[in-house]
């Protein structure tokens, strides 16, 4: 024996089993509290559906409307909300301790663009060969980055050595 499928969404027409409801007509006007049967008749006369909008109110609030259209509008709202949602990405900018000023400016411009888009930026400073003997140069460069982006970004992960590279993560304010 199978159980009936669980219906999601509001109850409509015959699925509304409460004795009395608070009715709102198709024009959005409050009709007051009435027996469910009367509300069903009013919906039938209008050629529309009786939809339970607020089921946990006392009495439940029902509205006369076209259920197909209502479902479509709800789906549209959900899709719009999903579209507006921004996924924060982690972008990476790779630097070297002895970076030239113009190269630094180009990287800084890219970082500004990432912050405007609302993304986090991971600044990776890679050391090669003898550069490992001077981690203070790398720290100085990352402090410069931190100071340059103080107004638009906050430090989420302080500069730290990880193997042959120094890493810092900045997030937009």
UniProtKB/Swiss-Prot annotation:
Cellular localisation: Cytoplasm
Pfam families referenced in this protein's UniProt entry, alphabetically: IF3_C, IF3_N
A single BP term in Gene Ontology: ribosome disassembly
InterPro entries: T_IF-3_C_sf, T_IF-3_N_sf, Translation_initiation_fac3_CS, Translation_initiation_fac_3, Translation_initiation_fac_3_C, Translation_initiation_fac_3_N
Subunit (UniProt): Monomer.
Family: Belongs to the IF-3 family.
Function per UniProt: IF-3 binds to the 30S ribosomal subunit and shifts the equilibrium between 70S ribosomes and their 50S and 30S subunits in favor of the free subunits, thus enhancing the availability of 30S subunits on which protein synthesis initiation begins.
Protein name: Translation initiation factor IF-3
Species in which this protein is naturally found: Caulobacter vibrioides (strain NA1000 / CB15N) (Caulobacter crescentus)
